[in-house]
Amino acid sequence: MPMQPSIRSLLQRWWPLGLALLAACLLRLCLWGNLPRQGMVSDEAEYFASAVWLAQGRGFSWHQEWLWTRAPLYPFFVAIHIRLFGISPTPVYISQFLLGLVQVALTYFLAMALVPASARAHDWRRWVPGLSALLLGLLFPLAVYYQVLLSETLYIAIILAGLLALVYWANSPSLQSRRAYLFLAAAGILFGLASLTRTLAVGFVAVAAGWVFLTVWLHAGSAQSLKERLWKSLLPAAIPLVVAGMVIAPWSVYASRAYGGFVAVDTTGAFNLLLGARTAYDGDRKDAPTRNFVLALLNTHMSQKEREVYLGSSCLAHHQDPRIFAAMERPSAEITQAQRQQLMTAEGLCLLQERPLAFVQKSLAELIDFFRINYGGDERFTNGFTTGRLHPSFVLATFLFDDTLYVLALPLAIIGWTLLRQLEKRDQTMLLACSTLIAWWLLYNLLTAPLLFAINRFRVPLLPMLLIFASYAVLALGAKAWGALNRRHAPHLVLAGLLAFVVAAPASWISAYNPQSDSYRAQESYFGPHPSSVVDTYLGLSSRDRYLASEQLRLDLANDQLESANILLASGRVDPNTTLLGRAIIEGREGRPEAGLALFPSEEQLALADRAWQARAAVVRGDLLRRLGEERAAKNTFTPRVVDDYNPVEWAWEWLKPSPPSDGRIDFGGNLDLGYIRGFYLGEGDGTDTWRWSAGEAALRFPEMGTGAPQSLRLRIDGLSSGLHNPSLVVAIDGRQVAMLELSREVQVYELELPATPTGEDVIIELHSPVFVPSAADLIAQQGPKVGQLRLLGVRLDWAELE
């Protein structure tokens, strides 16, 4: 049966969009559950924690104890999912998956609006929307971000929709018709929502209104009187401005009441202003001074002496500002977030006045960093790439669909924008106005982001527009349309070349320093030595075999295949540090712990090693001492700060197979529990007792303690500290529930009977519990390698005993 003409015409018209959506869908499905995560990144913990409290009906109170307050829309977006589906990010990821496809479609429609309608059916320009959407669908940052609890996915979708509404207004038959005004109102709503997602968009509302004013003013012509022309231009310009204000105002009222003073959207701007000013003043980027200043206004556990040190050394104190001394005299609990915002702003402005030229210099450096590639950025999930932990497909996708696509698109976008305005200038006035709008959006971000501080994530909202113009340039090149460029376009071409040089050139071409000298600081780039994208990609790929060998070693040790482990170690495929640990573990397992200890270098040499390896070495040495029965020495080995910093609970569970605990008891947080526990946070003291909080999924291991008969398990649990109304604990073995404990609101010992485990085998007990999110103070307390890692707390245990 022949295909109906209407269906055929639809396919002919929309197949490029369908192809782009399919490519985006396939890439995101390939990434589902496969991000090389090592924990939460950037602001994920803050967003998720505040959303959980919001979903529980506690409003935005979580931010009362945080360093700043946050725009509400993204926490609200996450909170809806938590309210409906529980404390899990997976439903959020699914919604963000769909939003990613919406971004592709919006980019397609925006590109269609920027290409002359008469040209789409006849020449190369008809392919611009499809190519733009396809490139955006393959853009790796956006493909990754749908599984990240950051606002980018939602924010970019809203921004694209807002820009599209303005472009549709400009393409309306009449700029002052009812339909045109509806587009302006829609743009106002969308930019208002964007402002409630990220405060940076607030300023662009005024920029967009200015663009509307100029568009109407130029379109009106000089035949009308100045007053009539002004009135006709002001009315449309006021619509998005007023509507956006109406969207933002209710939240401003709520936030101002909740945070004890005027807060327009959030207080992140004040914090970032202080951070940027502090960086300029000190000549170096250090977060600690800014953080300590804010903590002195926030942390109720900080001593008055510490507060006086941090606040007394401020710029405001140096200038005898009475506001800072008044804050010093008040308890931190009485200082509101709005007052902290005022003091952060005042301190930032004070520092700027001290060294204004340094701030200009810092901002220019930030502008360059804004364009540079940062291969190891948190949101790229590439940290530790030299260990080989990244799958080759992820490494190659990052190189091709992130770095390479960006390096090519950036200069091509400038050329494409120039070509668009040159080729369409004769009879497409509104098209030129729309390209001006996009240019204003790009310039607005370039001017505002580096003023405070710039990270690669901040440039992602610009990429959809850059890809549209880059697609135009590529297709124009194929059609030999670059001949339209002339001498008047030389500045644009120079700018394109300069940006290409900045992002792609090796650092040695830019820096005046000798790379071999101590003063040389490597700069990120696309080409050149480390940390360039090309070299780091090679390092990530070439180190994969060593990582796989280390993983095979871990599996051999876990499965008691010591002979296979020795053969692997002798092959030289395992890196030297892991080889040392592996040999020491095998010596201990074969009954020669003294020989294992003798393999380690001296304490002085250990102190010079990588801190993560120091922690693992301490765990192995402590286990060997524990096998010798030297518990005091083992405790001292497990105790160093570096072990606490990394809390290597999971690593010890996977690599060690310790001897049975003395008296059949695991003492949580007592410095001898590593290797026996999984899914527990750092230990903490409480009087004479030590405790550990469990995560939602945890486990206990009693090595070789199976008796072939039922056994008794005793747990000392603190139900009083739980943040849950009805704390509970499910105990299971091999996935089968053994007991369900309803915990009382007190410290209590619970006893239960376990089914028989074969004689001499490990008794592994699984613990499952609902979790709660502690206050923001708990997240602030996570420092060192655990900074930014949200703790989802289950139950608090003192000890576990198996009889």
Where do the language-model regions lie?
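Membrane-proximal stem/loop segments at transmembrane-domain junctions that anchor or position
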Residues: 264-376
